Structure formats: structure tokens, C-alpha cells
Amino acid sequence: RQMCIRDRPFSVFDNPNIAFRQVYEAALNKIRDQATKERLLYGNWDFVEANDMAIYNSFDGSRHLVTGLKEKAYDPTKPLITVWDFNVAPQMSVLSAQIDYENRKVYILEEILGKPEEKENNTPALARKVRLKLYRDKHIGGVDVTGDPSGLQRSTTNEDGINNYTIITDTFGRGILRPKVKLLRKQPPQATRCEFVNEVFGGYEGWEIQIDIKCRKLTQDLIYQLRNEDGTKSKQKTTDPKTGVKYERYGHLSDCLDYLLCYYLRDSWYKFKSGGDGNGYVVSTSVIQEGFSY
């Protein structure tokens, strides 16, 4: 006869030594951090605190994270959007996405990280890494390159006319990838754009966001990024123990998500931002002023 055995988390209460159990339980009960207490006292390693101060409080892992999404949804014959964040610590970050406008679905397919230990936290190296990945995926649908508008600024180490986006498009080349840069003219106001992203997580105008479960850093941002009182992101810094470099632990991949939604769902973004019904708003000159491509 077959037995059905279910995995159950092991906790302090399973320890047969009663005296030890009582002392240990009393010590664990003094822990203030609820997440740590849940994990150590109850063996609940999947516990994620629903934090009222989390800025993306409409994100719901059970609803928005999908196992095997890239394998199910990615279409190499359709345009792929790559969204770039140019911070070098703790890593450089790229999100890849495709949007099904007909069914109002945003597919976040993959996060690609340029880590310092692999010397990939610079634009040329990460662009080469992404190019190789696109070749391996046999991508023929064209590639959009978007992200932080400040990436257009010329670095002091570069010549005139060279910036992060020209480096990416030059690396992708003039062949099969056909890169196009598409950017907002300036960064969308942080508090407003975070409210907008929350609304989209909640189904604003029928939109649905699906994120491949392998996007671990993005998921961490969505769970742990805290909100300042003015509605902006709390950009707390932490120090790398090896290098002594200070960096923002959370927010780089969620910034990519913000830029993606504000540019590619811009009808909804303008409507949300204006507080109106959006009718006729997007055909005004604000589109020309705020979004451009070259």
C-alpha cells in the first residue's frame, strides 16, 4: 500500500528535549523581526512579511510570479524590449520583456545581471552578454533598448556622441538584432510612477503583469523596497564587506520595471498621471515631448 508523505517544515517544537525546547523558544520569542521569528521558531522559510511600508504593496507573488514563463510566452519573432539600469554596484541590470497589447499582458521574461566579480558591470561587457543570449535564443523580431534616460549623458571617459545607449546599439550591430533606442525624455516622477506600477499590478485598465519566477532580484525589489513618507523609494545604502563600496541594495530592477511600464503603457500612464479619462491626451504634444526614439 502506498503511503502519501507530505513535507512539513521542521521547527523547534519537533525537538524531543523539553527543557531545551522551552529555553530556545523563550529566546526566539524575544526576536523582534517577525520574518526571522517565523523562520527560526516555526520553520516557516517561505514567510514573507506583508510590509505596509513596502512601496510595491500591490505586488502579489502568488498572482504575478509564473514558473517557466519565458518558455511559455517568449516569441523570438516579435520585438524584445531590453530595459537597462546603469548602476555598477551591486551589479548592472537588464530586464527583458515582451508585451501583448491585444490581450493586455506584460511578460517580464528574464533579468540579466552584470556582476562585478565577472567584470560584467560595465556597458560594453553586459551588452556583449545580452547579444550572445539573443543569438542563442535565435531572436529575429528586433530589439528595443530602453531604460534610464540619464544613460544618454556622455561620460567624462567617452568622446562626444558616445553614451551608454550608443555603446549598446553599436555592440548589438546592424545585423539581425536591429536595435532601436526608445526613451522617455526625462525620468518619470518617482512617487507617481510607483503609484502607477501598483495600479497596473492591480489590473489597471485590464493590464496584467506576469514575471518569470527566475527574476529573483526583481522579486526582492518588489518585496523589500521600502517607501518614504513622500511616496518615493527608500534608497538605503549598504556597504560591500569585500570592497568597502557603498551601494543601494534594492531598487535597480524595479526602476527598470517603472521605465518599461511608463514608456510602453504610455496611454495608461498619461491617463493615470493626468487624472483624467485619457481621451485625446496621448495624441497631444506631450507624447512628442516626453517620449522619443532614434
Model-derived segments and spans:
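Short, small-residue-biased leader/transition segments that mark boundaries at the very start
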Residues: 1-5
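Short beta-strand scaffold segments in enzyme catalytic cores
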Residues: 92-98
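Mg2+-dependent endonuclease catalytic cores in nucleic-acid-processing enzymes, primarily RNase H-like
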Residues: 103-246, 267-268, 281-282, 286-294
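ATPase catalytic-site recognition across NTP-hydrolyzing enzymes
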Residues: 16-86
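Acidic, Mg2+-coordinating catalytic module of metal-dependent nucleases/exonucleases
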Residues: 243-273
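A residue-level signal for conserved active-site and pocket-lining positions in enzyme catalytic cores
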Residues: 10, 41-43, 94, 145, ...
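Class I S-adenosyl-L-methionine
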Residues: 13, 22-28, 91, 283-294
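Conserved AAA+ ATPase "SRH/arginine-finger" region at the nucleotide-binding site
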Residues: 9-15
